[in-house]
Swiss-Prot record:
Reaction equations catalysed: apo-[ACP] + CoA = holo-[ACP] + adenosine 3',5'-bisphosphate + H(+)
Entry GO terms, CC: cytoplasm
GO biological process annotation, one example: fatty acid biosynthetic process
Keywords: Cytoplasm, Fatty acid biosynthesis, Fatty acid metabolism, Lipid biosynthesis, Lipid metabolism, Magnesium, Metal-binding, Transferase
Family: Belongs to the P-Pant transferase superfamily. AcpS family.
Biological role: Transfers the 4'-phosphopantetheine moiety from coenzyme A to a Ser of acyl-carrier-protein.
Location (main, coarse): cytoplasm
Binding site for Mg(2+): 8, 63
Designated name of the protein: Holo-[acyl-carrier-protein] synthase
Primary gene name: acpS
GO terms assigned for molecular function: holo-[acyl-carrier-protein] synthase activity; magnesium ion binding
Gene3D superfamilies to which the protein is assigned, alphabetical: 4'-phosphopantetheinyl transferase domain
Essential cofactor(s): Mg(2+)
EC number: 2.7.8.7
Length: 131
């Protein structure tokens, strides 16, 4: 049974405008990335050949996950409580910790499905939570 559904779309240029353009070292100072990404995700962001696209997709996925939880970001759920990674086949997956994990339990959720897509100007994500 579906216990939560969330979707989000992000304009990649908007994210790109918030990323320092002075090279790889400047990525280490990106405040938006530090606020949104976990340590593991941040390391991948810094090493990415397309950091704005990477951050936009992670931002959309985390917003979609928070919407599926019914809280959005805030009210006990932060960006740091939601981690986006890839399974062995390369498919995106979402892991909930702390407040996000507690909210998932309150909903009776046991499985999260995540789809991320991007094209030239936009990144989008959808999360479905199942009991």
């Amino acid at each position: 049974m579906i216990v939560g559904l969330g979707t989000d779309i992000v304009e990649i240029a908007r994210i790109e405008s918030r990323i320092p353009a002075a090279g790889d070292e400047a990525l280490l100072t990106c405040r938006l990335a530090k606020r949104v990404l976990t340590e593991t995700e941040f390391a991948l962001f810094v090493g990415s050949t397309q950091p704005a696209r990477y951050l936009a997709k992670r931002f959309a996925a985390k917003e979609a996950a928070a919407k599926a939880l019914g809280t959005g970001i805030g009210r006990g759920v932060s960006f740091q409580h939601i981690e986006i990674s890839n399974n062995d086949n390369g498919a995106p997956q979402v892991v909930f910790t702390d407040g996000a994990s507690e909210r998932l339990s309150q909903l009776g959720g046991v499985k999260a499905h995540l789809s991320i897509a991007d094209e030239q100007h936009y990144a989008t994500a959808t999360v479905i939570l199942e009991s």
